């Protein structure tokens, strides 16, 4: 089947500047391209050719100084030659692209709350839902949000959790990885400290300021503790704004060392996870489900996260981490950090459990296989001219499984 992946206007593929959606796409392509002829339409980048074929995947990179320019270029590159057009995170684009290629089927991959009234009006939302053959979401939280606003969408919703490549991450408890861990920690002056790790964009909604506040009391009781902050204001750049400046100023009062790495290329992220002892995600917004949780699990780190959006769906309380209900209270975060610092055996057990979960449940092969089930079911029905039965086939033939930590049933 010939498939077009329509990527957002934000960042290019492959993820040379990072980005959760971009990493997701790169992760599944090696598996999907073995079964389907895939063209990836993404944003132009000075460091990448406008067109190329890599590992059976065709890439076409389009200019897009504005969202409208990018959409126009997408329309110029979409035609009925594709059996399926899979649109990432832009329900508003489904109808304009469908008008350009009325002979193609469409599907949608949701990574944010893109069906909220401030994102799309009701008329276009309903047209989008009616047009697409299926919708995948990265969390139950996102799926439930769509269903709550548009119950008619329920038959088309499929939760497909994201993934990670565990082989890129080096669990901190394995002896063979200790030399590289020690070398990196020494490079940053952290070799004598327990390192609390934050990875993500430096924005108020990601909550690093809450972690800094929490570290004030942690460092009072545990002076051999350090904070490492990996990330920048935006993907691929190291410019600052008022928030990042205030954040750095806040750390000046901390008694222990603090390291801001700035933006790191995606290829550098896995080894930097090995520097940490405890991973903390302090999201303050309705996070769809931050992919850093998968990365922390792969690195074998115990996780402390806030109960925001879909984050809790991949945390099994007391098994691979802890979910903090009081998401905006620094002391609630600090209490969990101190608990893990004081109970090293529990921290190690959580980290080892998380690594196992990442290996068995949150790898890219599992993500790709779930997508292949949807694609295969659709292509089979389409070939027989019976597309109307597609949704019932998916619901009847897809096994149920429980949401980690929640116990609710879902379609994978």
What are these regions (language model features)?
Residues 274-288, 301:
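Acidic donor-binding loop of glycosyltransferase active sites
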Residues 332, 339, 346-360:
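A short, well-ordered alpha-helix in the C-terminal region of glycosyltransferases
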Residues 4-6, 136, 185, 190-206, ...:
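Conserved donor-binding/catalytic core segment of Leloir-type glycosyltransferases
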Residues 302-305, 315:
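Short hydrophobic beta-strand element within catalytic cores of glycosyltransferases
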Residues 87-93, 110:
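Short His-centered aromatic/hydrophobic patch
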Residues 241-263:
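Nucleotide-activated donor-binding/catalytic signature segment of Leloir-type glycosyltransferases, i.e.
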Residues 263, 271-276:
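Short alpha-helical donor nucleotide-sugar binding micro-motif in glycosyltransferases
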């Amino acid at each position: 089947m010939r498939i077009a992946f329509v990527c957002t206007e934000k960042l290019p593929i492959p993820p040379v500047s990072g980005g959760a959606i971009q990493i997701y796409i790169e992760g599944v392509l090696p598996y999907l391209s073995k079964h389907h002829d895939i063209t990836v339409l993404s944003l132009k980048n000075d460091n990448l050719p406008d067109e190329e074929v890599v590992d059976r995947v065709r890439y076409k990179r389009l200019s897009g100084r504005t969202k409208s320019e990018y959409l126009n270029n997408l329309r110029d590159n979409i035609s009925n030659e594709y059996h399926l057009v899979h649109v990432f995170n832009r329900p508003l684009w489904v109808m304009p692209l469908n008008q350009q290629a009325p002979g193609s089927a469409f599907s949608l991959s949701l990574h944010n709350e893109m069906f909220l009234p401030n994102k799309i009006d009701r008329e276009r939302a309903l047209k989008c839902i009616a047009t697409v053959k299926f919708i995948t979401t990265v969390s139950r939280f996102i799926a439930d949000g769509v269903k709550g606003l548009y119950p008619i969408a329920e038959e088309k919703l499929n939760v497909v959790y994201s993934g990670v490549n565990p082989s890129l991450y080096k669990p901190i408890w394995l002896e063979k990885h200790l030399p590289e861990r020690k070398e990196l920690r020494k490079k940053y002056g952290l070799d004598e400290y327990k390192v609390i790790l934050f990875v993500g964009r430096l924005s108020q909604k990601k909550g690093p300021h809450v972690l800094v506040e929490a570290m004030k009391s942690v460092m009072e009781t545990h002076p051999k503790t350090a904070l490492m902050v990996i990330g920048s204001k935006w993907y691929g750049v190291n410019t600052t704004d008022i928030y990042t400046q205030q954040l750095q100023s806040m750390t000046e009062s901390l008694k222990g060392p603090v390291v801001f790495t700035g933006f790191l290329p995606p290829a550098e992220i896995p080894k930097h996870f090995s520097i940490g002892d405890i991973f903390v995600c302090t999201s303050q917004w309705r996070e769809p489900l931050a992919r850093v949780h998968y990365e922390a699990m792969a690195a074998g780190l115990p996780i402390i996260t806030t109960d925001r959006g879909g984050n809790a769906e991949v945390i099994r309380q007391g098994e691979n981490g802890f979910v903090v209900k009081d998401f905006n209270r620094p002391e609630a975060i600090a209490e969990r950090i101190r608990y893990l610092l004081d109970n090293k055996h529990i921290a190690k057990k959580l980290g080892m459990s998380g690594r196992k979960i990442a290996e068995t449940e949150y790898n890219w092969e599992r993500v790709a296989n779930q997508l292949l089930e949807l694609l295969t079911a659709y292509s089979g029905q389409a070939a027989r001219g019976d597309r109307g039965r597609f949704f019932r086939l998916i619901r009847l033939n897809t096994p149920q499984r429980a949401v980690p930590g929640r116990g609710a049933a879902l379609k994978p």
